């Protein structure tokens, strides 16, 4: 038997004191179909609850599962869609993901795989998709304990939607990384799922004053 836990934060602009709701807030329905941004998302030009936002997360979804091959591993997948609203938001197309990869090979390892991404731009009334090339992906040694996955989404400017996906494999299945329901950018939709085998028991702790559906 497996246990499924879902943490879900929907339309966090209604919850967060950092991004207060305005009286005339106009929101768009979250579109969770990865690879298929909606017309409303493509035409979005500003974010009413925080008009200073350079970009917003349209969604960030995560899913963790346990696999077994000569021992348990924990896998965590990320699916992200971000709308660039202002020129200074272009920097969010450069993504860095640190992960544990000690030089001592006798220790447990983490690795990143299944990395993909693309950008979407409206040109002459048509949605133009530009996939990320493999040469835009790199792995850098940060120190003797960590590596950093780095990649840059192409053809990004004001108005662009970027999407990316990656998967982390970890030998440290006894430790589940924290999941941040809110980031420095406004978050329209955030969801994390984990399926836990019945042989494992974890303590789940929610932090923050706002209610999160579990």
Where are these regions (language model features)?
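Bacterial Sec-dependent N-terminal signal peptides
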Residues: 1-26
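Beta-strand-rich, non-transmembrane domain signature
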Residues: 21-214
């Amino acid at each position: 038997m497996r246990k499924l836990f879902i943490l879900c934060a929907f339309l966090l602009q209604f919850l967060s004191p950092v991004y207060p709701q305005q009286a005339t807030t106009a929101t768009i329905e979250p579109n969770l179909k990865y690879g298929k941004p909606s017309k409303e998302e493509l035409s979005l030009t500003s974010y009413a609850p925080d008009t200073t936002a350079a970009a917003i997360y349209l969604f960030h979804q995560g899913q963790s599962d346990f696999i077994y091959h000569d021992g348990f591993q924990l896998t965590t997948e990320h699916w992200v869609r971000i709308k660039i609203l202002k020129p200074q938001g272009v920097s969010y197309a450069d993504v860095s993901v640190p992960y544990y990869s000690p030089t001592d090979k006798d220790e447990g390892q983490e690795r990143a795989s299944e990395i993909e991404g693309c950008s979407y731009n409206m040109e002459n009334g048509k949605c133009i998709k530009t996939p990320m090339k493999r040469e835009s992906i790199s792995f850098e040694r940060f120190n003797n304990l960590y590596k950093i996955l780095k990649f840059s989404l192409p053809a990004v400017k004001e108005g662009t939607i970027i999407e990316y996906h990656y998967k982390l494999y970890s030998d440290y299945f006894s430790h589940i990384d924290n999941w941040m329901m809110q980031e420095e950018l406004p978050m329209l939709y955030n969801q994390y799922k984990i399926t836990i085998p019945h042989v494992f028991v974890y303590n789940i702790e929610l932090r923050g004053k706002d209610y999160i559906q579990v």
